[in-house]
Amino acid sequence: MQHFFADPSCVDGEQIRLAGSDVNHMKNVLRMKPGEEVWISDGEGTDYFCKVEGYEEKEAVLRVVKKEVSQTELASRLILFQGLPKGEKMEWIVQKAVELGAYCIVPFAAKRSVVKLDQKKAGKKRERWQAIAKGAAEQSKRGSVPQVRNVMSFREAMNYAKELDVVLVPYELQEGMKATEAVISKIEPGQSVGIFIGPEGGFDESEIDQAKETGAIPITLGKRILRTETAGLTTLSILMYHLECREQLEDKNIK
């Protein structure tokens, strides 16, 4: 079933008036007709099961059949700090990170980043990445659209991460899977977690030292060297599994 996002202001009791590019997609691409069903999320934790009533000028008019609290968001905020990769890899990373439950994605320029973006190019890239995030959120039935932040320097990204409960830095020279397991096992639902991923070539040693000084925890993801587009998604997958298992266990204990 199709899934779209609407601003809460579009919701008026038992009716939603959807505007913007999604209307053209519904009407002319999907050719949705009156009576067809669709899910609408307001981005603030409420999902609406609706039926299409019709189209008026630049709006799609939907009738709310039922509403419910979104069940697809993690209890924790997982923030992916991604060192700028080459080519179009960032688009793929954004898409998959959203599917895996990332709350926010922060691109940053590391010492070994090959890609250099001026302010104008960075702005255009961010618009593109945000559009991809929205599409991925709709496809994966997310209750909200994760934000892609402006490109930061490594220092700016570290300062941004200071307010988080836990900050993890997968690092190829770090050893000890037991230590990684111990760190992740202590993460509780509701905590905010930052994940720092280096670009191609990894982190410079001085960046790891700086990360440690701010309280970040270097971890290993195993014996193999992962690509920049794989490392973050691997970490998100591990955290998603851990947190959802903890949530289910807590729900079971409450019942």
Q: Where do the language-model regions lie?
A:
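N-terminal positively charged helical leader segments and presequences
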Residues: 1-69
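Short, ordered loop/turn segments at secondary-structure junctions
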Residues: 9, 67, 109-112, 223-224
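Residue-level signal for inorganic ion chemistry
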Residues: 35, 97, 133, 211, ...
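Generic structural signal for residues in well-ordered beta-strands
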Residues: 62, 145-149, 218
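RNA substrate-binding interface of SAM-dependent RNA methyltransferases
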Residues: 71-168
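Short, hinge-like loop/turn segments at secondary-structure boundaries
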Residues: 122-126, 186, 237-238
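Active-site/ligand-binding-proximal alpha/beta "capping" segment
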Residues: 165-202, 206-208, 216-219
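Structured adenosyl-cofactor binding patch, chiefly the S-adenosyl-L-methionine
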Residues: 204-255
